[in-house]
Regions:
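Conserved PLP-enzyme active-site core in the AAT-like
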Residues: 14-213
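PLP-dependent enzyme catalytic core of the Aspartate aminotransferase-like
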Residues: 52-53, 58-63, 74, 98, ...
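Conserved C-terminal alpha-helix-loop-beta "cap" of PLP-dependent enzymes
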Residues: 216-293, 297
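Aromatic- and Gly/Pro-rich amphipathic surface segment
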Residues: 1-10, 18
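A common structural junction motif
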Residues: 171-172, 259-270, 312-321
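Short amphipathic alpha-helices in soluble, non-transmembrane regions
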Residues: 164, 254-261, 308-313
């Protein structure tokens, strides 16, 4: 079954949900009033919304931590009821020091959860590092074909499995039969797809880093990435997600996204097709650098992808110079 397959990938007991958000919500819903929780400064916007709503209602207090500030996360594990990590983080692609953070001794009631969507089970194993819960939006890389909604929680403890199973029933968050079938189909080719996509990502990140119209590239596989050494210590691969910042004003980044022909200008990610978008235009993402483009690298020919990126960057540069 789907849950047996997904549990095997993450080395735990898995529960499938109707979406990634449905899976994440179950974890936050278990917190009693007065809880303390820690989340990244810039988490997935749906998680940010859940946390902000509970904060407004007075349900919990929140620490928003820099993903790279390992000392603050270590302190949070000792003091909070829920520690929610997202690694690599969306959209800055920052990798948390999971071996250190997840290995901190903690109270039995404290839960350390990791959104591992960008890494997939093939690139990191949070449960083996000491996490209690791993969450994936299976809509993304596990499904891999941009044609389903699904989520998964994999846990290391039987009591959490039973609790989340009950909450899934109470909240009507069970996955549909067709979505379960499609997720199984996608998971069977995850290894092949990820191998190609992350090889493409490494090549494109390297080339973008040297492009005259790009001011910064964020990809854990690059030695220039702030958390490259952290990622290299425990990840099996660096994934297929990267982000880069164009030169010029923020609007120029939007134009680059609109100019591509092979790469889709879209918000979803993790499919066989490449997608990208300017994240600062998304509500709640105003703190993101204005020219940052999040790029989900697919399985197309890498030379075709590079030609598309290069022409979009050059075309918008020519217009900018002409306007000046």
């Amino acid at each position: 079954s789907l849950e047996t397959l997904l549990g095997g990938l993450d080395s735990g007991r898995a529960l499938a949900f109707a979406s990634g958000m449905a899976a994440a919500a179950v974890v936050f819903q278990r917190l009693p009033v007065g809880s303390q929780l820690a989340i990244p400064t810039d988490p997935y916007h749906g998680v940010a919304g859940i946390v902000a709503e509970g904060e407004r209602q007075g349900r919990w207090s929140v620490r928003r931590l820099d993903q790279a500030d390992t000392a603050s996360w270590v302190a949070a594990v000792a003091e909070c009821d829920l520690v929610w990590l997202e690694s690599p983080e969306n959209p800055l692609i920052t990798v948390a020091d999971l071996p250190t953070i997840c290995g901190v001794p903690r109270a039995d009631a404290t839960i350390v959860a990791v959104d591992s969507t960008f890494a997939t089970p093939l690139n990191q194993q949070p449960l083996a590092l000491g996490a209690d819960v791993v969450m994936h939006s299976a809509t993304k890389f596990i499904g891999g074909h941009s044609d389903l909604l699904a989520g998964v929680l994999t846990v290391s403890r039987d009591d959490l499995h039973d609790e989340f199973h009950e909450r899934r029933l109470l909240h009507g968050a069970s996955i549909g039969a067709m979505e379960a079938f499609l997720t199984i189909r996608g998971a069977r080719t995850l290894g092949l797809r990820l191998e190609r996509a992350q090889a493409n990502a490494m090549e494109l990140a390297t080339r973008l880093e040297g492009h005259r119209e790009v001011s910064r590239v964020r990809y854990p596989g690059l030695a220039s990435h702030p958390t490259h050494e952290v990622a290299a210590r425990f990840m099996s691969g660096f994934g297929a997600m990267l982000s880069f910042e164009t030169t010029g004003p923020g609007e120029r980044a939007t134009e680059v996204c609109e100019r591509t022909e092979l790469i889709n200008h879209a918000t979803s990610l993790g499919g066989v097709e490449s997608t990208m978008e300017r994240r600062a235009t998304i509500p709640g993402q105003e703190r993101i650098p204005p020219t940052l483009i999040r790029f989900s690298v697919g399985c197309e020919d890498v030379e075709d992808l590079w030609a598309d990126l290069d022409q979009a960057l050059d075309a918008t540069s020519a217009r900018r110079r002409g306007a000046g």
